[in-house]
């Protein structure tokens, strides 16, 4: 959000915040508008809960298809699933260029943007992308601003478009991935002494490693 607001301050345009979740998630959009987003899109339906990331991407595309955007900026990962894939999936479904782990952006002209990407071991890469583009922003790219009292008061005058499964023709959507079980592995410790000759110890230890340790 902060990167989008900075781009708007330099180059103009409109910032539209978008989120998918339960009714409580609508507060996130109110906070975004209080900080400077011009309007918001809220996608919410019980049928959208527990969907896989590809299906979620398709839902976003259905909600955004009528938007005339130049940039889609997404975070590093969501708090619930943490897939780190939505930005890439949106770029594929919308036939847009994409960059991940973005640490800095620079609008070059109406048709191109330059992105500084974080690589491993302290390395960075500058890459030029055509617009429109989907860019996944790395954590720590900037310091998010606080909402001002004026910004909070202006939220009531800003528009939020809300979509459910019927609005998006997604009443029959089903997960492509089913989560059968989610659990914390049981940790246990055991000490065992193996006696015998060298050959016997090797044979017993080999049997333990092959058949008992998982």
Regions found by a protein language model. Name each.
Residues 1-214:
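N-terminal glycine-rich FAD/FM-binding segment characteristic of electron-transfer flavoproteins
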């Amino acid at each position: 959000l902060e990167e989008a607001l900075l781009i708007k301050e330099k180059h103009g345009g409109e910032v539209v915040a978008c989120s998918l979740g339960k009714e409580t998630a609508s507060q996130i959009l109110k906070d975004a508008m209080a900080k400077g987003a011009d309007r918001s899109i809220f996608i919410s339906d019980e049928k959208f809960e527990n969907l896989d990331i590809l299906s979620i991407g398709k839902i976003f595309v259905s909600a955004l298809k009528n938007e005339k955007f130049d940039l889609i900026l997404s975070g590093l990962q969501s708090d619930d699933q943490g897939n780190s894939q939505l930005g890439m999936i949106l770029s594929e479904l919308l036939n847009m260029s994409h960059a991940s782990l973005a640490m800095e952006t620079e609008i070059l002209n109406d048709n191109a943007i330059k992105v500084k990407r974080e690589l491993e071991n302290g390395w960075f890469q500058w890459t030029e992308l055509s617009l429109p583009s989907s860019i996944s922003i790395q954590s720590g790219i900037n310091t998010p601003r606080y909402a001002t009292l004026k910004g909070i008061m202006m939220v009531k005058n800003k528009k939020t478009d809300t979509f459910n499964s019927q609005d998006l023709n997604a009443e029959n959507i089903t997960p492509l991935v089913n989560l059968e079980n989610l659990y914390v592995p049981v940790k246990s410790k055991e000490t065992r002494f193996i006696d015998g000759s060298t050959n016997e110890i090797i044979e017993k230890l080999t049997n333990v490693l092959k058949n008992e340790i998982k």
